[in-house]
């Protein structure tokens, strides 16, 4: 395993750890909404059986399967890329954090619910988590990196 690959998986591991710690804290301490910035940002505990930003609610097993496929693809793609590993690590870490929830949170084994807790009126009715932000940053960063390399 190359140093680059080790750094990649160390970053992914750190991102998954950060995601799981924030979800644990939200689950343990958010009994009700906590307003951080009035009319802009609040913490709201929610459980999501859909994808990022509550898209596709009720299809947890499908997003679990797609997440596993994405993790395998990124792992396969990593040694074939010469670009920055940061955006791929953000993508891999975010996907892995939510796949972890689907696997180990009730009702378990691919059907678990993802813990969401970040809420802003900018995205009406959408509650999300740190892993969703990692995925979003990874997708946009990878897209911009690939677009800029042409």
UniProtKB/Swiss-Prot annotation:
Keywords: Aspartyl protease, Cell membrane, Hydrolase, Membrane, Protease, Transmembrane, Transmembrane helix. InterPro entries: Peptidase_A8. One of its GO terms (cellular component) is plasma membrane. Disulfide bonds: none annotated. The keyword Transmembrane applies. It is a multi-pass membrane protein. GO terms for molecular function: aspartic-type endopeptidase activity. Pfam families: Peptidase_A8 (PF01252). The active site is at 116, 132. Its EC number is 3.4.23.36. It is found in: Cell membrane. The chain crosses the membrane at residues 8-28, 58-78, 81-101, 126-146. One of its GO terms (biological process) is proteolysis. Pathway: Protein modification; lipoprotein biosynthesis (signal peptide cleavage). Belongs to the peptidase A8 family. HAMAP family: LspA. This is Lipoprotein signal peptidase. It comes from Tropheryma whipplei (strain TW08/27) (Whipple's bacillus).
